[in-house]
Amino acid sequence: MEFVKSADVVVIGGGIVGTAVLRELSKYDLKCVLLEKEPDIAIGTTKANSAILHAGFDAPTGSLKAITNVRGNALYHELQNELDLDIKWTGSLVAATTDEEMQTLQELLQRGKKNGVEGLQILSKEEVLEQEPNLTTVKGALWAPSAGVCWPFGAAIAFAQCAVQNGAEVIRDCKVLGFVKEDGKITGVETNKGTIAAKYVVNAAGVYADEIAKLAGDDTFTITPRKGEYILFDKTACSSLVYGVVFPTPTKKSKGILVCTTTHGNTFIGPNANEQDSKEDKAVTTTGMNEIIASAKKLIPNLPMGAAITE
């Protein structure tokens, strides 16, 4: 087998996870290579999400997600200083509009405390309106001061640039086709740009992680794509709709349609959450838009839809 290059670690996937892993590994005396199938990094899920640095109150206590969420939130404070990341620590509100939802907030409060989230408190309607005057329908809210919003695209680029400065390599337009194995162990990664020898492989391929795993002989899981749609508002016409992150009270399906202001000053509403077969279908639908608007209006009845960006 002829290898075009060799690496100690090959990271598959150039999103926020893959680039963060690459940066961390690049701190050590290792030859690290990241493979990204697209023309640039961070143009998959990383570029199209709510960009929230969650406080950590929602995940089940004791779960890996709960542990890493709280730890990750703290790490981003350090990363912001180290890499000059674009982050605004706005805090988040989980808004309740019914007595039943107020009870759910109490459950989230207790779970958050068990998870180690600091500063959580239940706010009255009056206290909520002091922070977010447009939330006129709320009865109260759970306040999480440690939450924030970031610019994920910029964060992934910062991770990758730092890793490259440390000696790592990023190869774009590089699709993984298979793996070389010896005695049941992966020793190389086959790509459209040749085969790379590898001692270790990190699968950070996002919604395609199951397909990469199958190429390696692991068929223990599958990923069902779930698409979320958003509506983005013009910041010049809608600059003070909300200050920070506003969630509705969550359901078993999702955290719900939220209202949030990005690090660049635009407000958005969304996303919905619809499972689909395609991993590439990013179409925005009329049904989806209507769903988002109706849900967001439960929190802010007077949404300025004339300020929505449509082109």
PLM features: residue spans?
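Helical element adjacent to the flavin cofactor pocket in flavoenzyme catalytic cores
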Residues: 142-200
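Short beta-strand to alpha-helix junction loop
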Residues: 60, 67, 95-104, 143-161, ...
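Glycine-rich FAD pyrophosphate-binding loop
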Residues: 26-47
